[in-house]
Curated annotation (Swiss-Prot):
Keywords per UniProt: Acetylation, ATP-binding, Ligase, Magnesium, Metal-binding, Nucleotide-binding
Post-translational modification: Acetylated. Deacetylation by the SIR2-homolog deacetylase activates the enzyme.
Keyword presence, Ligase: yes
The species this protein was found in: Aeromonas salmonicida (strain A449)
Designated name of the protein: Acetyl-coenzyme A synthetase
Function: Catalyzes the conversion of acetate into acetyl-CoA (AcCoA), an essential intermediate at the junction of anabolic and catabolic pathways. AcsA undergoes a two-step reaction. In the first half reaction, AcsA combines acetate with ATP to form acetyl-adenylate (AcAMP) intermediate. In the second half reaction, it can then transfer the acetyl group from AcAMP to the sulfhydryl group of CoA, forming the product AcCoA.
Pfam entry (one): AMP-binding_C
Binding positions for CoA per the UniProt entry: 191-194, 310, 334, 522, 583
Amino acid sequence: MSESKVYPVKAHISNGALLDKAGYEAMYRASVQDPDAFWGEQGKIIDWMKPYTKVKNTSYDPGHVSIKWYEDGLLNVSANCLDRHLAQRGDKVAIIWEGDNPAEDRKLTYRELHAEVCKFSNVLKAQGVHRGDVVCLYMPMVPEAAIAMLACTRIGAVHSIVFGGFSPEALAGRIIDSGSSIVITADEGLRGGRPVPLKKNVDEALTNPDTRVSKVIVLKRTGGNVAWHNHRDIWWHEATAAASSDCPPEAMNAEDPLFVLYTSGSTGKPKGVLHTTGGYLVYATLTFKYVFDYHEEDIYWCTADVGWVTGHSYLVYGPLANGATTIMFEGVPNYPATNRMSQVVDKHQVTILYTAPTAIRALMAKGRDAVEGTSRQSLRIMGSVGEPINPEAWEWYYRTIGEERCPIVDTWWQTETGGILISPLPGVTDLKPGSATRPFFGVQPALVDNMGEPLEGATEGNLVITDSWPGQMRTVFGDHERFEQTYFSTFPGRYFTGDGARRDEDGYYWITGRVDDVLNVSGHRMGTAEIESALVAHPKIAEAAVVGVPHEIKGQGIYAYVTLIAGEEPSRELHKEVKEWVRKEIGAIATPDVIHWAEGLPKTRSGKIMRRILRKIATGETDSLGDISTLADPGVVDKLIREKSEAA
């Protein structure tokens, strides 16, 4: 096999695994040769109120992109995650909640979770939420976040979750775009020992005159002081106290919207990724089962926040549809002690751990302290998600956290894909550190050059997917034209991922990162355009350009070139002020790591900023700038290089 390091499947894994190499090959072959037959059979992994007779009805044709799966079937997501388990697994723990403070934890059985979801479903109905309405969630990592999600699905409402780290401005934009008239939040969140002012942020977001929110349901998490609007605000505990724990699930069409989740694009404002009910749930359920080699007795921990797609698919829906025990962690991996993540593994006897390279690199920087005094013997499978994992971090994770016992499933997928597209499978795949390896069933990746010509064999190029799969997003909320433009216009007839990849001689895929103007910071996607817009909204800034630079913990750091308006001078105070400004406009996650005060930016004669050059300057690769003859003023480049060395 190519690439220096290969870790073959270990006997103790293959002996108990759901699939072996031959099983994978046969299933994969069937999935691409006859998708209708394959997905028709796999669709039965969930329960249907009215079985489907149609399976796949999809088109990637220019101007006619349309994606439908199981389109005449009826089902309910919450019934699949709860009701169907009550007879056999009613007393099994569904959610283990581990608080920010290690002294706080809770367990909810499937029966208890079912009752809470029914109560909250009735609360939503009483507040006038109807089938098809969009409900905005801005919640901490507590079981009530999952309860609210499942309650929406029970009554046929569409949830739009906004990560609790986003600013009031970012929250308002998402509330307006989705048309939410109700927000579910908490007084405060807790993270790393510090309160997060969720209710205060909601109050501020709702001062935007374009919001149309009539009700805010508030969970009491910390008991911190919050402002109160009597006609608008409702306490969660008061509303649920009198609610009935009986609420029959709505029969939803497979193509009814399930949720909207906003993600950054390379241009303009974030786009609402729309996922529908049937195909999404089939895909989340099936990928969870096979990628994590799920067995009934497993204790599964995905460290992602519910505000990200990983939290949707692999903390809530995938695990619960499989009847698994899923851990929900409010805190951060290194608080109050460096070995917190390992402590949680031991405390709850976690068998499957799914986390992000950023967390792994942060722990790796602490060395053995990250595992001090813990055994982690319960671990069986470990996963990585959010961005490509560098081989050094992979090796450390494998050796130090998993003690060379646990295969690592390095999963590649996106908000848009609904679930994992490329990943090793335990029991099947020999591992190579840093490679996402092979495609999941029904997923047909290809590499193309910049002209869209297919590249064969071992090569590198733009990663496209040539046919649809059930978990694929259906459209951009309210803007199908943007959906086609973003994903299907670059390489017509194919879904363009926006990522580059390398394929080795064993057919393994190595994701090389974004090829568009999107950054991946700590596993979170951010469009450079979004950060640039926030910067130029500052009254003293005339122009800004943002590029990604390597960062040893976050994967990518944010490097901002900033040109001030005439008459303004750079200063330490302004530097601090600009960082604060971005934090307020978008959230702490978008704060620039470097601000480079630039007199001018390299532009073509048509006025386009040459980001390629800015990237090279930011990373110090100034001896390989390439052709700069098309620049309107080539002298700008020397000036930028000088400024950088002076700033350093």
